[in-house]
């Protein structure tokens, strides 16, 4: 929150728990699996998803960013359940994003607001 306040922006950091904050609110997102950090391109995919969510919701940057990160983490969980190996995992993440409905995201998002 302090960094977001100092720079008048939304800050996002990913890791075991993903954090998305503005000056007053912080989402702690618990979707995803550790294996995602070893897959080349997941960060790039996430950047594109965040950009598209913010573009579609420019007045809700904090919530759009949190939703995008929930979506990517949930897609990683779904892909892991269907995983055949490291090479196919990346493709399964893309498939999970493509096939995810708004209700799937609403049911599967794991977060708390602080």
Region spans (language model):
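Conserved phosphate-donor
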Residues: 1-37
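Hydrophobic transmembrane alpha-helix bundles
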Residues: 9, 13-16, 47-58, 99-110
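Short, small-residue alpha-helix embedded
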Residues: 40-71
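Short, surface-exposed loop/turn motifs that are enriched in glycine and acidic residues
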Residues: 35-40, 83
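Charged C-terminal helix
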Residues: 74-114
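Short, well-structured alpha-helical segments that form the helix of a local strand-helix-strand
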Residues: 1-4, 61-76, 93-94
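N-terminal loops that bind phosphate or other acidic moieties
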Residues: 18-32, 57-58, 81-84, 98-100, ...
């Amino acid at each position: 929150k302090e960094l977001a306040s100092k720079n008048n922006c939304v800050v996002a950091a990913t890791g075991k728990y993903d954090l998305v904050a503005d000056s007053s609110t912080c989402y702690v997102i618990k979707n995803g699996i550790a294996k995602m950090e070893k897959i080349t391109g997941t960060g790039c995919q996430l950047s594109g998803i965040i950009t598209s969510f913010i573009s579609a919701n420019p007045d809700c940057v904090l919530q759009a960013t949190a939703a995008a990160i929930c979506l990517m983490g949930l897609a990683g969980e779904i892909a892991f359940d269907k995983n055949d190996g490291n090479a196919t995992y990346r493709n399964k993440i893309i498939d999970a994003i493509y096939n995810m409905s708004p209700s799937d995201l609403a049911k599967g998002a794991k977060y708390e607001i602080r």
